[in-house]
Amino acid sequence: MSRQPILDIKGLRTVFRTRAREIVTVNDVDIVVNPGETVALVGESGSGKSVTSLSIMRLLARKVGFIDAGSIILRGKSGQTVDLAAIDEEAMRRIRGNDIGMVFQEPMTSLNPVYTIGDQIGEPLRVHRGTSRREALEAAVELLDRVGIPDARRRAGQYPHELSGGMRQRATIAMALICNPTLLIADEPTTALDVTIQAQILDLMQKLQSESGMGMLFVTHNLGVVAEIAQRVVVMYAGRIVESGPVKEVFRNPRHPYTMGLLRSMPRLGDATEMKRRGEKLNTIPGMVPGLANLPSGCAFAPRCSFAVEACHAAVPPLASVNEHHGSRCIRWQEIAA
């Protein structure tokens, strides 16, 4: 299998317009996704994760959000590369649902309530390949069966409200994969599901990925999910990448205080009883994510950081190389240990 990247983002900068000013929501973001690889994009709400994924798909609100700088190079099914940041909307329509599939957080809002499940899953085939409605429906039924929906033919004739939350999410996964994309973007696809269904959906996505060899950008705030599904992790804070590297290395040896704070605030099995016995509380990160319209000077995390020194407030730190595969946007990364 070719190791040329499926997705290669360099220097992505996304801006939102307000009546008063322009606000940078994603700043200088670099992400690479290889064939068969899952890269997790993590951070608190407001960190820029979802705006990054919407920028890749060019689904930003018109006249409000726009890509101001950078490139988004996609290697499609033909093997040819295209810069998604530079093409027009007509060209982008030929790529969405064909070379790139996307699974959204809440399936009830991403599925159309007035069309049957089968029609919605089959629509990308009709749009991109000119498949007949009957052939598209047969393909949809087959894929519904593959994603684990029982009695797939009957379910294909039903409407979204007639399916459970887990079934709806399986249907949106089927819709995203119907054209065999090279890249799947999954934006918090398991957040609205209970833990049992969440585990089933994660297993399903890994199985389908191993069968197709597609790359996956998995957007989440759940580090437990990251440990299970991803090979590399990109941590975002206030619109910038603050740490990136192999999941095992970053989790074992985080080199940014924000990553360390996220990991330490994760509850672990057995912790509650032991912490109660000791009279301890769950670790938290003090403060809140700053508003992107009013970022502090220097490192945006400095006001919440126990490692911060005067120099942290002077300038935005560069993304330093911890090693060939691991980067940290912290001037004190060498002093930080988990």
Curated annotation (Swiss-Prot):
Q: Entry's Gene3D superfamilies?
A: P-loop containing nucleotide triphosphate hydrolases
Keywords associated with the record? ATP-binding, Cell inner membrane, Cell membrane, Membrane, Nucleotide-binding, Peptide transport, Protein transport, Translocase, Transport
Q: Which GO terms describe its cellular component?
A: plasma membrane
SUPFAM superfamilies (UniProt xref) = P-loop containing nucleoside triphosphate hydrolases (SSF52540)
| Membrane topology of this protein | Peripheral membrane protein
Question: Which top-level enzyme class is recorded in the Swiss-Prot or TrEMBL entry?
Answer: translocase
Ranges for the ABC transporter domain? 10-263
E.C. number(s) listed in UniProt? 7.4.2.-
| Any single GO BP term | peptide transport
Q: What is its main location?
A: membrane
Instruction: Identify the residues that bind ATP.
Output: G43, E44, S45, G46, S47, G48, K49, S50
Annotated localization: Cell inner membrane
Pfam families from the xrefs?
A: ABC_tran, oligo_HPY
Q: Does the keyword Nucleotide-binding apply?
A: yes
The superkingdom listed in its UniProt entry is: Bacteria
Q: What are the protein's GO molecular function terms? A: ATP binding; ATP hydrolysis activity
Q: Does the keyword ATP-binding apply?
A: yes
Q: What does the similarity note say?
A: Belongs to the ABC transporter superfamily.
Function according to Swiss-Prot or TrEMBL:
Probably part of an ABC transporter complex that could be involved in peptide import. Probably responsible for energy coupling to the transport system.
Describe the protein's quaternary organization and the partners it interacts with.
The complex is composed of two ATP-binding proteins (BRA0404 and BRA0405), two transmembrane proteins (BRA0407 and BRA0408) and a solute-binding protein (BRA0409).
* Database matches in NCBIfam families: oligo_HPY
Query: What protein name applies here?
Result: Putative peptide import ATP-binding protein BRA0405/BS1330_II0402
